[in-house]
Amino acid sequence: MLNEQDSVTEHRSRRKIKFALLGPAFIAAIGYIDPGNFATNIQAGATFGYQLLWVVVWANIMAMLIQLLSAKLGIATGKNLAEHIRDQFPRSVVWMYWIQAEIIAMATDLAEFIGAAIGFKILLGIPLLQGALLTGLITFLILTLQRYGKKPLEFVVGGLLFFVAIAYVIELFYSKPKFIMLGMSMLLPILPNREAVFLSAGVLGATIMPHVIYLHSSLTQDESKTASRSERYSSTKLDVAIAMTIAGFVNLSMMATAAAVFHYGGYTGISNLDEAYLTLSPLLNHTAAIVFGLSLTAAGLSSTVVGTLAGQVVMQGFVRFHIPLLLRRVITMLPSFIVISFGIDSTRILIMSQVLLSFGIALALIPLLVFTGNVKLMNELVNSLWIKLIGWLITIVVIILNIYLLIGIII
């Protein structure tokens, strides 16, 4: 009898540990539903209907594997990806990596910050500059949660992720997509023209986020006193599966809603978020438009927090330089205010930032695969042969797409 009770107690204890370890992937997943995703998915859906849904599906599957490898690196070694690059690569290469990672982090932050500002503009009817100031203030408040430990921040960011997911369940309900066409487009790879390739690269850059690859390895690198490495890795697999499935659903819903409402409603030229909001109201109803504005704001606010955290990890990891998070937030806000002040097309900036991000994916992936495939570093958590093959295949696909994009830009 005592043995049975001990067994039940141990099982409950392990289950508590498993759930206590959930959370880091939800912070990482926020990077996959930022305003850049809104802009790219809406333009892709409005222009090509359901045709590019397969890109979202495969990009999300790739992202799941990549985030799992990043988290696994932190668990197995107690160091994040940037720290491993600093320790094992030549100094000149480390500085090159740091500079490109900072540029990518700033491009990401630009997209996220402007997206949240657009959300406030839509909801409150205020100028974009005031929306940007409000975004900065709320981001500061969310970042102060870090002084109370990781869990409060994980709880808030995870809550915003669920909010955006629920918002898009509502959007799907109102838009009434053609589910047979939707399902077929998720399976059939089609790239009708060069613009589709450009938008696909944007979708890839918006779905697989280089800065989140660096961040996730830092979120799991702390030693746990209550769980073994195998237990932590087991919990991480569940964490990544749940969080990335939610993020994938949101991205699919964004594109499917845009396809159903705009493309098949005859509004194939929708190219910015303000236009999308204004068109949603007469085509569906005012509630759908408000839900869109709320989800954009929530995604923008949460992803700016994640972007700031990632920027700090990149700076500390590569060059051992630390500045207070709030000061970093002020510095990274400046490009957004410049874009807004000069009246540059904010949605175009969002999409271009996502294409820029796609160029940083391979640079993060190559060292990640090298380190997680090293048995001396990873021990029993080293990548299997299949994982190595799939990882390098993903890297090759990303590089080929980037080369195609570069040729297209030059020509």
Curated annotation (Swiss-Prot):
Does the record carry Cell wall biogenesis/degradation as a key word?
no
- Domain of life the protein comes from: Bacteria
User: What InterPro entries has UniProt attached to this entry?
Assistant: NRAMP_fam
**MF annotations from Gene Ontology:** cadmium ion transmembrane transporter activity; manganese ion transmembrane transporter activity; metal ion binding; symporter activity
| UniProt keyword terms in alphabetical order | Cell inner membrane, Cell membrane, Ion transport, Membrane, Symport, Transmembrane, Transmembrane helix, Transport
The protein's matches in Pfam families, at most eight in alphabetical order, are given as: Nramp
- GO terms for cellular component: plasma membrane
Q: Which residue ranges traverse the bilayer?
A: 19-39, 46-66, 98-118, 122-142, 153-173, 196-216, 242-262, 289-309, 323-343, 349-369, 390-410
GO process terms (BP): iron ion transmembrane transport
Task of the protein: H(+)-stimulated, divalent metal cation uptake system.
Protein name stated in the entry: Divalent metal cation transporter MntH
Q: Which organism is it from?
A: Blochmanniella pennsylvanica (strain BPEN)
| Lineage, top ranks | Bacteria, Pseudomonadati, Pseudomonadota, Gammaproteobacteria, Enterobacterales
